[in-house]
Amino acid sequence: MKRPVAVLAGIGRGVPEQVMTNEDFASIGIETSHEWIMERTGIAERRIAREPEQSTAWMAAEASRKAMERAGVNAGEIDSIILSTASPDRLLPSTAVDLQAELGASRAAAFDLSAACSGWLYGLTVGEGLIAAGSAETILVVGSEKMSSIVDWSDRSTCVLFGDGAGAAVMRRSRDGRGILSSYMRSDGTLAELLYRPHGGARVPFCENVLSERSHYVKMAGREVFKHAVRSMADAVDRALDGAKLTASDIDLLIPHQANIRIIEATAKHANVGMDKVFVNVDRYGNTSSASIPIALDEAIEQGRVGKGSTVLLVAFGAGFTWASMVVRL
């Protein structure tokens, strides 16, 4: 097992107060039911950012301030800000620089990272590398998503799945043996069109046809995504445990990406971890993309499921396809 380079010094989450239940879909003309959604996804409700000021950067700032407070860090100490999002507030410049301005982190380098639901773990891995290289000592890594702005609210297959929220971590150099014990990242671009936003980018910019065809919204081939998600999450679990030279019995808590309860259960089964050692909050938040793992980790700490010295396994998959995992000693 390697000696950790970087430790997660503070975690925080920021979620909008507005709750949308499964029953609420009837009010917007979606033919579905609580039972139908729960049976297929395990989702009962999700948070929706409906107020004008509740942007991706706003939620990121809410989570970041809590993480910074818990880490005992002020904005002037932050060297780098890495913000993972699939729902940036605008295409140019990055949402990270808006977050930087909101926090007053004037000496930080700030940039966005795009790896969909795996993005927060990608960000932690990049941050660990910056600390190892001596390029930074204190890094803010955020996953923030306003998924409600990029889903088609007339498409039952996608709009019931997603929610809004943000999670953040302050990373610092490890000095006591706690921190990241292993990390793993993979991608397979041949699967990109299983889960994607077809148009609205540089290849096919926004125009009347894009808007009328609603092709700027998330499209998903659900069955194929499920199959590849289970396979990639299993690979990620194995690689993280092997990298840390640990077994499932050494893990205090498994925190998988909160996409779908069936994927979570399949991941736990492959990892040989009982569901009593798996953190689940997909029922209350839905799929918040790259924010899901930091939100879950923050709640797990808050609920006393894990604490200082606990060993957690984090594992994610997302559009791209991307997948990633990490073993962390808190």
Map each language-model feature to its residues.
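Beta-strand segments within the central parallel beta-sheet cores of soluble alpha/beta enzyme folds
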Residues: 37, 76-84, 111-114, 136-144, ...
